[in-house]
Amino acid sequence: MNSTAVRTDEHLPTGRAARRAEVYGVDGSRRILRPARPADVRAIAELVRPYAERRVLIAKDLISYFEDIQEFIVAEEIPGDAGPGGADGGEAPAEPRIVGCGALHVMWDDLAEVRTLAVHPDAVGTGLGSAILRELIAQAREMGLKRVFCLTFEEPFFGAHGFVPIEGTPVGMDVFAEMLRSHDDGLAAFLDLARVKPNTLGNARMLLHL
């Protein structure tokens, strides 16, 4: 196992469950997973930027992150902890900084999508990405969801967490008709609609059954 998480549950002023997890990486790093806040948006955008430039993740405007911020969790590196800049004996960051993120977007009463999973380049291979994904899956279970979808180039990574490739549209016609009312590109990718295929070439459509 690449990381260990110890969770405590609290409540944000909005009533949204505030899950906090301490994550220990294979490099000895310690980071905190927590719900994202509006103040994290620019850090999230900066994490995603190099992935979007390589077309691994979809580029988004800042306003999109603000609109969806309640779907995100972030991994925060705490001053004095090992991690990027500190795990190899170098200086730890002077202030907390965001070194990972991921989002869970609900698409139907039994279905959600993992979106925008990204980690700082220095944190790749430490188990942080897996820890974020496991936390998003845990949130899906808590909400009573039965399936989690992802659109990804990283098929081996998601496959290691139980996701399997899918073909076609794994919903009935009534649900399909309702989903067509949405303008969301992620939902269109789940439905395998032609309008998003130019932007998803090479991606695998994968599904996890909970």
Give the ranges of each region predicted by the language model:
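A short beta-loop-alpha structural element at the N-terminal edge
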Residues: 30-44
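Conserved beta-strand in the GNAT
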Residues: 74, 95-106, 111-118
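A short, internal acetyl-CoA/4′-phosphopantetheine-binding micro-motif in the GNAT/acyltransferase core
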Residues: 117-124, 153
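C-terminal "cap" of GNAT-fold acetyltransferases
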Residues: 171-210
